[in-house]
């Protein structure tokens, strides 16, 4: 199981849409002398507060990339996935899950974290920290105070430096309340104290209230009309989710009323249901909460899966084992196929360094902008110059063309002047358009209605770009450059110098 998970993670395409932004922030952390407190990337938030609260995984991503490129990043992703599997297995061992329930839970855990959401993002560290917190609570319940408190401390330190929802690490403490008769006196106090102490190990300890206020503020990208798929409310997503995900979600919904749950002591069920409710609340707010719900409901889910009866006939049991082995072999194969599907066809431009979902559309733009902003004089003049794009493009462009300051990226903390334009997605009749009044370059999808405004604006010129042979223009991002900027960068913006015009 561990080998299948590690190999699957190693072969995953690293196609997470937010990964380039995490790499950009990691680069900033590697090259800066202190911890950022002001916006470092986007001109639309210039001077606004910002904190790199996920600094640990972002720094690791940037270090791995600097050392070995995509191979180093894949190796780090495999290590983190393996650590998550081991953390879950430890919980299964300490809580005496059945062999059958452990296998089913780990199998679904692998599918969720390597196929459904193969995230090379800080959330994966939370998939290590939360199971570690469960393991810590179980050790404290069993009287292993030193090991339990130390594990809770480490889990809290990992979580607070990796993810905004680090407070979820307190939920496993409910297990100590659930088995208060078995747990030694002071076990809960030790768990809470170790967790709170671990949370102090962040460079942003005194800024945590400001971090929560910034990231949980009302935003046009949230809610029922969310333009970002992972921010879609959970029950709305459920109505059109794939059948397998609907089945898993239904199982999660009915966990507290299953016979496997009623077979547990009343106190244990009551407190574990509180943790389940916390996860349900996250799922109701946004579908991305499903994975966190999975982590918070681990004991109840494992009990439900373990209650599924095993086949009695030897031939049927052999078939079940064969299907199990087939799934373990199919996971790496599916990851490899996903990597191949994300690869960009050969073209005269350099191969994208990451198989980002928008790489094929953006690499012609990237090649031209990198060429134009190359060189000491031009680069100095261009650093910090404003550029405008859309949410889906911003993460990749912020990483690939850091010499320009982009209007938006993969974060959800932008002002209404930016986020409302993203929420409406440039539809015809939109009252909101991406802010481009001070931009020297604008990069938009071919269908974006703002493109017609730019075509009619004499201050801008549309740049013809090289594309892969046979690649239709509608699949390549469009680029407009300010005429005065084109004149300032001089010959580099010409047809032959930067390869545009095919």
List the predicted regions and their residue ranges:
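Transmembrane catalytic cores of multi-pass membrane glycosyltransferases
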Residues: 18, 30, 71, 164-265, ...
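Membrane-interface transmembrane helices that cradle and orient dolichyl/undecaprenyl
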Residues: 131-149, 178-179, 255-265
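Short hydrophobic/aromatic helix or loop-helix immediately within or flanking a transmembrane segment
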Residues: 44-71, 75
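Membrane-interface alpha helices of multi-pass inner-membrane proteins
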Residues: 6, 110-114, 135-136, 147-164, ...
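Periplasmic/luminal catalytic loop of GT-C fold multi-pass membrane glycosyltransferases
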Residues: 400, 418-472, 476-477
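Transmembrane-helix motifs of polytopic, lipid-linked glycan transferases
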Residues: 75-95
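Membrane-proximal, lumen/periplasm-facing interface regions of secretory-pathway glyco-
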Residues: 316-378, 392-394, 401, 421, ...
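Short periplasmic/luminal acceptor-recognition loop of GT-C membrane glycosyltransferases, typified by
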Residues: 376-418, 438-446, 480
């Amino acid at each position: 199981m561990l080998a299948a998970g590690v190999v699957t993670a190693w072969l995953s395409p690293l196609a997470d849409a937010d990964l380039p932004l995490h790499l950009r922030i990691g680069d900033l952390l590697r090259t800066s002398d202190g911890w950022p407190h002001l916006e470092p990337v986007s001109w639309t938030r210039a001077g606004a507060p910002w904190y790199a609260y996920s600094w640990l995984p972002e720094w690791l991503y940037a270090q791995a990339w600097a050392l070995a490129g995509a191979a180093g990043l894949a190796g780090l992703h495999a290590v983190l996935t393996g650590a998550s599997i081991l953390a879950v297995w430890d919980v299964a061992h300490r809580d005496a899950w059945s062999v059958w329930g452990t296998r089913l839970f780990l199998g679904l855990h692998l599918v969720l974290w390597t196929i459904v959401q193969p995230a090379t993002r800080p959330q994966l560290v939370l998939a290590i920290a939360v199971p570690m917190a469960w393991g810590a609570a179980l050790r404290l319940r069993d009287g292993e105070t030193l090991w339990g408190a130390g594990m809770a401390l480490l889990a809290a330190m990992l979580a607070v430096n990796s993810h905004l929802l680090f407070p979820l690490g307190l939920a496993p403490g409910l297990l100590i309340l659930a088995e208060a008769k078995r747990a030694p006196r002071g076990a809960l106090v030790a768990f809470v104290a170790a967790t709170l102490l671990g949370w102090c190990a962040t460079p942003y300890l005194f800024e945590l209230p400001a971090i929560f206020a910034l990231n949980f503020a009302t935003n046009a990208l949230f809610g029922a009309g969310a333009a970002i798929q992972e921010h879609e409310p959970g029950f709305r997503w459920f109505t059109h989710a794939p059948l397998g995900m609907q089945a898993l979600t239904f199982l999660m919904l009915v966990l507290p009323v299953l016979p496997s749950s009623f077979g547990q002591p009343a106190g244990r069920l009551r407190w574990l249901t509180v943790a389940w409710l916390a996860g349900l609340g996250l799922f109701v707010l946004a579908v991305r909460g499903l994975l966190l719900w999975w982590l918070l409901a681990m004991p109840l889910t494992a009990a439900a899966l373990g209650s599924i009866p095993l086949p009695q006939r030897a031939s049927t049991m052999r078939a079940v084992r064969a299907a199990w082995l087939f799934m373990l072999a199919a996971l790496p194969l599916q990851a490899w196929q996903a990597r191949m599907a994300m690869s960009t066809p050969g073209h005269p431009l350099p191969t994208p360094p990451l198989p980002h979902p928008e790489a094929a559309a953006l690499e012609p733009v990237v090649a031209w902008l990198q060429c134009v902003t190359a060189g000491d004089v031009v680069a100095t003049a261009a650093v910090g110059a404003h550029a405008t794009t859309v949410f889906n493009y911003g993460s990749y462009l912020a990483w690939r063309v850091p010499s320009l300051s982009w209007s938006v990226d993969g974060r959800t903390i932008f002002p209404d002047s930016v986020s409302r334009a993203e929420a409406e997605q440039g539809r015809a009749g939109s009252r909101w358009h991406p802010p481009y009044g001070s931009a020297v370059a604008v990069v938009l999808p071919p269908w974006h209605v703002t493109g017609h405004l730019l075509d009619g604006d004499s201050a801008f010129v549309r740049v013809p770009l090289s594309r892969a042979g046979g690649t239709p223009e509608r699949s390549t991002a469009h680029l407009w450059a300010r005429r005065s900027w084109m004149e300032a960068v001089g010959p580099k913006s010409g047809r032959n110098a930067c390869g545009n015009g095919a």
